[in-house]
A protein has these predicted regions:
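Conserved N-terminal segment of class I S-adenosyl-L-methionine
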Residues: 1-97, 101, 115-118, 189-194, ...
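S-adenosyl-L-methionine-dependent methyltransferase catalytic module, highlighting the catalytic core
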Residues: 11-17, 22, 47, 86, ...
Length: 242
């Protein structure tokens, strides 16, 4: 999973924590070819930025994090890394910059009003620029099994991370998140995840078969087999939005 630290009302130690993962490659695959300038909102220690730089060496990457310690690490891949609470006003110097793409990788579920925050950052995207989003799917098969067993407990990580303030599904994510952003038009929605093959996957099926079954399951039943929902929206001028 791609859990993030909270951006609001966190303890002082949250400002010094360091969050690392391997980046969210399936989400970054939604970037248009050769983006010139990208903003990663909730960039952590720069794992997404590292993947972007490996693929697009000339891309100028900016990031936002709540942790000064993370920012120091992330700067090795970034032109600038901003440290502030995204539920407050965007600093004037940053608000004047336009980005080909803005990334929200497992960040919006931590916010009180993620749709409003998304709309605020949408103004940093020019016409035909994009916003790409990843949020966890609360109704994946694994979560449904937990609910069926009567389990609904917050945890330090995962879908029921105790810092998650909003829950999304494949069906509801785009409808809720884009509701306050008339400038953004949905162009794609998909999931990544897996079908519960258990011992078949481990001992019997070739990896290519397992990947095929996972892909088929995610395409046909995304709300059941998807672990994360991936959304891409493109900015249009307001006078063209119906």
């Amino acid at each position: 999973m791609f859990d993030r630290a909270p951006f609001v009302h966190g303890p002082v130690e949250a400002q010094n924590r360091i969050y690392r993962n391997h980046g969210n490659a399936p989400l970054l695959a939604l970037l248009d070819d050769e983006p010139r300038k990208v903003l990663d909102v909730g960039c952590g220690a720069g794992d997404n930025a590292g993947l972007i730089k490996a693929r697009y060496p000339r891309c100028e990457i900016h990031g936002i994090t709540y942790s000064a310690a993370e920012a120091e690490i992330a700067k090795q891949w970034m032109s600038a890394c901003w440290v502030f609470d995204i539920e407050k006003e965007i600093p004037g110097q940053l608000s004047a910059v336009k980005f080909d793409a803005v990334i929200f990788s497992h960040v919006l579920e931590h916010l009180r009003d993620p749709a409003a925050i998304l709309n605020k950052f949408a103004h940093l995207v020019p016409r035909d620029g994009c916003v790409i989003i990843a949020v966890p799917n609360t109704l994946s098969w694994a979560m449904r099994w937990q609910f069926l067993r009567g389990n609904f407990e917050y945890r330090p990580d995962g879908v029921l991370d105790d810092t998650h303030l909003r829950l999304f599904t494949f069906v509801t994510a785009d409808r809720y998140l884009l509701a306050k952003s008339p400038k953004l038009k949905l162009v794609s929605k998909s999931v990544t995840g897996s079908v519960p093959l258990w011992w078949l996957r481990r001992y019997l099926l070739p990896k290519t078969w397992s990947r095929y079954i996972d892909g088929l399951g995610c395409r046909v039943w995304p709300n059941l087999f998807g672990d994360q929902v991936l959304i891409k929206a493109v900015a249009a001028s307001l006078d063209t939005v119906s």
